Amino acid sequence: MKRILLMSLLAISTALSTQKPVELELWPDGAPNSNGITTPEQKLENNRISNVSEPTLTIYPAAKPNGLAVVACPGGGYIRLAMNHEGHDMADWFNAQGITYAVLKYRMPNGHHDVPLSDA
């Protein structure tokens, strides 16, 4: 009986566990162009961020992948990024469908239109 209970708990905890997200630097050897932003990245209300000069890709692997993946590029009018409600908050739903999900934190253009396109 104890063995059945232990095996059941193990199976349930394995099924409910999600893999941890992995954050990768998009340009580990330096970006191909600069947006001229030298001030530190700012965290704003509701987990919005601005002054992005170091782009990253956060990957949420699905526990049971089906071969599909989605990359979210949160909006914010090229002034800030809405990282939660247009990014990270959707990971659980996609992972439940077997879809690997990624969120791109891209650089702000700061007058250089090619910078965010380089990150995409």
Predicted regions mapped to residue ranges:
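N-terminal cap/lid segment of alpha/beta-hydrolase-fold proteins
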Residues: 19-65, 113, 117-118
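Short beta-strand element of the alpha/beta-hydrolase
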Residues: 67-76
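Catalytic nucleophile-loop/oxyanion-hole region of alpha/beta-hydrolase
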Residues: 82-83, 89, 104-120
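Non-catalytic cap/lid and distal C-terminal segments of serine-dependent acyl enzymes
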Residues: 61-63, 82-85
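A fold-wide structural signal in alpha/beta-hydrolase
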Residues: 69, 95-102
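Serine-hydrolase catalytic-loop signature spanning alpha/beta hydrolases and amidase-signature enzymes
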Residues: 77-79, 101
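Bacterial Sec-dependent N-terminal signal peptides
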Residues: 1-21
